[in-house]
């Protein structure tokens, strides 16, 4: 799966009334009506012992300059990194992220050693205009503008 490019997010949640987070790249849109998204979480994570049906979680879509936050919330904790949480929407989100999504859990499905958290979007906001942080083949990458060799015309369909 390392040859599939993904965006990088930090999923934020409340644990014992305090802001907490974990890095996740298994985040996706599920439905437009209703607006549903999903995140895949390892069963042994603190998230799964804290967040259940009806609870909220936040998805912070990281900018390419936020590798340090990805590493921090991915388990390589930095004692010197200040986590820039804010709660303008009564929920902890990360300053400097490309976008923020707040989600209410509507379903949880077991999938091997993970749980799939499906949630209805309750809030979306744009954050910092910046290129996204992406991950490919075990490394962070930067997106470059690509000039396609073939032009796609919407009238042609798929």
Predicted segments, located by residue:
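Basic, polyanion-binding surface patches
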Residues: 1-158
């Amino acid at each position: 799966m390392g040859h599939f490019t993904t965006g990088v997010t930090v999923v934020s949640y409340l644990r014992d009334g305090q802001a907490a987070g974990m890095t996740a790249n298994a985040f996706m849109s599920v439905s437009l009506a209703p607006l549903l998204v999903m995140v895949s979480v390892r069963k042994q994570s603190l998230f799964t012992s804290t967040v259940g049906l009806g609870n909220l979680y936040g998805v912070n879509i990281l900018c390419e300059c936020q590798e340090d936050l990805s590493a921090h919330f991915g388990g390589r904790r930095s004692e010197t990194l200040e986590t820039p949480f804010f709660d303008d929407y009564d929920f902890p989100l990360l300053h400097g992220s490309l976008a923020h999504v707040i989600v209410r859990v509507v379903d949880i499905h077991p999938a091997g050693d993970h749980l799939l958290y499906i949630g209805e979007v309750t809030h979306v906001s744009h954050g910092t205009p910046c290129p996204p942080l992406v991950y490919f083949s075990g490394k962070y990458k930067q997106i470059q503008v690509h000039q396609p060799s073939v032009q796609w015309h919407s009238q042609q369909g798929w």
